[in-house]
Regions:
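N-terminal "arm"/small-domain region of PLP-dependent enzymes with the aminotransferase-like
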Residues: 1-52
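Short acidic capping loops at alpha-helix termini that bridge into adjacent secondary structure
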Residues: 70-74, 95-96, 142, 178, ...
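PLP-dependent aminotransferase-like
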Residues: 89-148
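Phosphate-binding glycine-rich loop
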Residues: 57-96
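PLP-dependent aminotransferase class I/II
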Residues: 32-33, 198-273, 277-280
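Conserved PLP-binding catalytic core of the aspartate aminotransferase-like
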Residues: 264, 276-306, 328
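Conserved PLP-binding active-site segment of the aspartate aminotransferase-like
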Residues: 221, 288-294, 306-345
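Active-site phosphate-binding strand-loop segment of PLP-dependent enzymes
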Residues: 126-182
């Protein structure tokens, strides 16, 4: 066994979501798609979708048309985290990885698995912003990959292409993880992959498309990068049923667009209603909030109503340990548990 693996600790989440009435802890879509469309999809399924290995050619072409890229710019994977894993396998050989801290935890996991030094750059203590200039100070000759979630999780901030250009100018592969970009009014960097040969973008069907259970992710980059990343692909990247559902969502993208718009409007509404709370807004489909008692009463109310959320410490410099991260869903502000939160804690 590789000696460094002894230091890697993984956590398995076996939370039984059926015990909760509201699932708002992992940025998933908990609002069902319209029943008529779901029924239409179910009727489209055939036994062959389960019995045979999938042919992804047409699906890949549909993705490329949707994102206005060429097939040689796309790598399809079993979730975007497998795309990220394949990027580690392609570019890292025990060098160092530079990213923001906190961020998506799998960056650190993959750094450990591939025996890379993980350099997590903290947000500024005073401004609570991530300084790209400061981040660059940790990039050296041993840096093999720079990663930036954009918008970031859990902070929810966004960097423009001009802001990250100094990272791209290093010539080191730069991975921009755009898992939440659809909930932002900011631009995606996919259109820049022809301008920057070291730019890599990952996207997912899990968040805005509401298909987390399908495990379908995409990586976009220049043909040379994609050719080499694809050497680490699984024999069959995704299941036939997952492919068919995601293809259905692309064909009926107005369902996705409505959900995104409804989430963004609900997020604005909730920020107004929770003006008396400590709030960390985001460019994603969630917010963090805290109260004078570090969310002690919040937890009592949400537990009573069987609401599953996530509690965490966001900033390494913050004194409060128990920020509540809640996924924004259309109509969230009309739920009884939310009204009770406002009445009890405002």
């Amino acid at each position: 066994m590789k000696p460094h693996l002894h230091k890697v600790k993984r956590i398995f989440d076996y939370t039984d979501k059926s015990e909760y009435d509201f699932i708002l802890n992992q940025s998933e879509r908990s609002q069902p798609i319209p029943q008529s469309y779901y029924t239409k999809f179910l009727r489209s399924l055939k036994q062959e979708d389960f019995a045979y290995y999938p042919n992804t050619k047409n699906f890949k072409e549909k993705i490329c048309n949707f994102y206005n890229v060429k097939p040689e710019n796309l790598f399809l994977s079993d979730g975007s985290d497998i795309g990220i894993k394949s990027i580690f396998e392609t570019f890292t050989t025990c060098g160092n990885i530079v990213t923001s801290e906190p961020s998506f935890p799998m960056y650190k996991v993959y750094s450990s698995l591939y025996n890379c030094q993980y350099k997590g750059i903290h947000y500024d203590k005073d401004t609570r912003q991530l300084s790209i200039e400061h981040m660059l100070k940790f990039v050296d000759d041993e840096t093999q990959l720079i990663i930036l979630a954009n918008p970031n999780s859990p902070i929810g901030d966004y960097k423009t292409i001009d802001e990250i250009k100094p990272l791209l100018d290093t010539g080191i592969p730069v991975l921009i993880d755009e898992a939440y970009i659809e909930f932002s009014d900011k631009e995606s960097f996919i259109k820049y992959i022809d301008d920057y040969p070291n730019l890599i973008i990952t996207r997912t069907f899990s968040k805005a498309f509401g298909a987390a259970g399908c495990r379908v992710g995409m990586t976009f980059s220049n043909p040379h990068y994609i050719e080499n990343i694809s050497k680490f692909r699984q024999m069959y990247e995704i299941s036939g049923v997952s492919m068919k559902y995601c293809e259905f969502l692309l064909d009926n993208h107005h369902i996705v667009e409505k959900y995104i718009n409804d989430v963004v409007e609900e997020r604005k509404k909730i920020l107004t209603l929770m003006k008396d709370f400590s709030i960390l807004n985001s460019e994603a489909n969630w917010i963090h909030f805290n109260t004078h008692d570090d969310n002690l009463k919040t937890k009592q109310i949400l537990d009573k109503h069987k609401v599953l959320v996530k509690y965490c410490k966001i900033h390494p410099y913050g004194k409060r340990e128990n920020w509540c991260r809640i996924t924004i869903q259309p109509g969230l502000s009309e739920q009884e548990f939310f009204k009770e939160l406002l009445n009890e804690l405002s």
